[in-house]
A protein has these predicted regions:
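Sterile Alpha Motif
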Residues: 2-16
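Alpha-helical interaction/regulatory segments in DNA maintenance proteins
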Residues: 3-6, 46-74
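Beta-strand-rich cores of mature extracytoplasmic or soluble domains
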Residues: 78-91
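Residue-level recognition of specific faces of alpha-helices
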Residues: 11-14, 25, 36, 61
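Catalytic DNA-binding helix-loop module of base-excision-repair DNA glycosylases/AP lyases
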Residues: 21-29
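Eukaryotic low-complexity, proline/serine- and acidic-rich intrinsically disordered regions
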Residues: 32, 50, 89-91
Length: 91
């Protein structure tokens, strides 16, 4: 799939922690660019993907989205940040 001459989702795959499966899932819920992901934020993006793909989505994906936007590898994310993200995702 192409959008404005670019392969859709490729830009998302350039982010740390995100690969082709994550990119396809984000695209499926309408998030096709880094800018769209930044605007929506990791929690809302996670919730959309989790609603669309409940059996394929774990809390690790939430951490991956957060880390992707901050350029932080999953292994370097603090337990405090993870707890805050989980609380926000629960609403």
């Amino acid at each position: 799939m192409r959008n404005n001459g670019k392969v859709q989702g490729f830009e998302l795959e350039s982010l740390k922690n995100l690969g082709p499966v994550s990119s396809r899932q984000l695209q499926a819920v309408g998030i096709e660019t880094i800018e769209q992901l930044e605007t929506m934020g990791p929690v809302q993006a996670f919730q959309l993907v989790a609603n669309q793909f409940p059996s394929e989505t774990s809390v690790t994906f939430l951490y991956a989205l957060h880390g992707a936007l901050l350029d932080i590898p999953l292994g370097e994310m603090s337990d405090q940040d993870k707890a805050r993200l989980r609380d926000q995702a629960r609403g």
